[in-house]
Amino acid sequence: MSGYQNGGPRGLADDSDVEEEALVADYREQVQYEEGMDDPDMGLAQQTDDIQSRLVAAAQPLDFSAPLEVKFQSYDQYCSLFHFILNSDGPVDLEPPSYYWAWDVIDEFIYQFNSFSSYRMRIARQANNEEEAQILRENPNTWGCYSVLNVLYSLIQRSQILEQLQAMKRNEDPMAVAGDYGSRSLYRMLGYFSIIGLLRVHCLLGDFSLALRTLDDIELNKKAMFARVMAAHFTTYYYVGFSYMMVRRYADAIRMFSHILVYVSRTKNFQKNAQYDSITKKNDQMLALIAICVAFHPTRLDDTIHTALREKFGDQLLKLQRGGPESLPVYEELFRTACPKFISPVPPDFDNPEANVDPIEHHLSVFMDEVKTNMWSPTVKSYLRLYTTMDLKKLAGFLSVKPEELRSWLLVNKQRTKQLRWADHGLLDGELVNVSDLDYAMQGDLIHISEAKVGRKLVDWYLRNLSRTYV
């Protein structure tokens, strides 16, 4: 691992030398070549065939019910493969088995990391399988966050994919900065999809801002490399949209979810493979997230999405739009249905099962705090729309709350109507805009209200529906 240590995850550079050396030593033990790889008598052709078979095997899904021993073996095999790719003397002269291979490897690598972390947390919390708990206790770094992040960052650094993407943005030749490794398809594609992998891992760990920051050098458009692989396309927009939702940028989240759902609906007749079929099963999750975002930020949706949303979550959406305590269980249900399977960045405490907090429950709690803050928003706005000026105490009487509590809520809500909206640069950047059609200002106890309604574009509506009728 020392050969590509500079590619390790950010924020770990300040660790003590002793701790770093321990991690390096532990990692080296875990990435030894499989038996026979160092045999000098093995022919070059036999070695090449063995590596090719390992490349193919790395992209194959692991059975969900695989025993713990198999999960450990899978981790060792991944470590061995990435060690060979990253630490060989010079770039490995191999071509990927297929165009989709690099994505499949990164996708499966992160899936197994996610699955193992969830399994380990479940064993620790249940405390009813002492044998497996002891094995997991003795191997805390197997499928650890440090190892997984280090592999992804190392693949990105070795391939110099960030430099290549930056050169492409400047309309320069990316091969001029690719180097010996980045000029080869194997490294370039692994490095590129490792960026998407980092987006996913940081989101699973709950660092949503860093997740968005990882895509600074990737342009979200149809020409991007990830858009050529349907599963990568779907995954990218799902995690970007979810990260936006968790940092309260609901307009941008709706934009991301809408893009991929419309794309899926328009291409379903052209793609008939197992990968596509598995993606379409996740559409309900995306619709559930859109329902949540629309409740926070009412907006017009594409007709296709609006129709699907009404069919799948019509009753729930109505409760969300009404607000109040009745909406809380609906928010919780939709969030559990559609959120990623969050993981903890550290191994669980097997000796104190009750001290382990379920990561999903933790993020649900954070999300529900935001929901409770906005719970009365629909009711308050329904009153404000009826007036141009209104006394604070009068509105407080309608809502049966104390005037000062209402004042605090109005100030917080007004602040949150100002949101960043992504335009063109980094995903965390954007223009500060008012995302609500209802605005108000407070002068002492007097509330001044203004409403800006955008007229419906009937011409566009007629054209869309006429094209559906006659096409």
Curated annotation (Swiss-Prot):
Subcellular locations according to the entry: Cytoplasm
MF-aspect GO terms: translation initiation factor activity
Keyword terms: Cytoplasm, Initiation factor, Protein biosynthesis
Primary location recorded for the protein, binned into one broad class: cytoplasm
GO cellular-component term (any): eukaryotic 43S preinitiation complex
Residue ranges annotated for the PCI domain, each copy included: 252-446
InterPro entries according to UniProt: eIF3l (IPR019382), PCI_dom (IPR000717)
GO biological process terms on file: formation of cytoplasmic translation initiation complex
Function: Component of the eukaryotic translation initiation factor 3 (eIF-3) complex, which is involved in protein synthesis of a specialized repertoire of mRNAs and, together with other initiation factors, stimulates binding of mRNA and methionyl-tRNAi to the 40S ribosome. The eIF-3 complex specifically targets and initiates translation of a subset of mRNAs involved in cell proliferation.
Self-association and partners: Component of the eukaryotic translation initiation factor 3 (eIF-3) complex.
Record family assignment: Belongs to the eIF-3 subunit L family.
HAMAP family: eIF3l (MF_03011)
Protein name: Eukaryotic translation initiation factor 3 subunit L
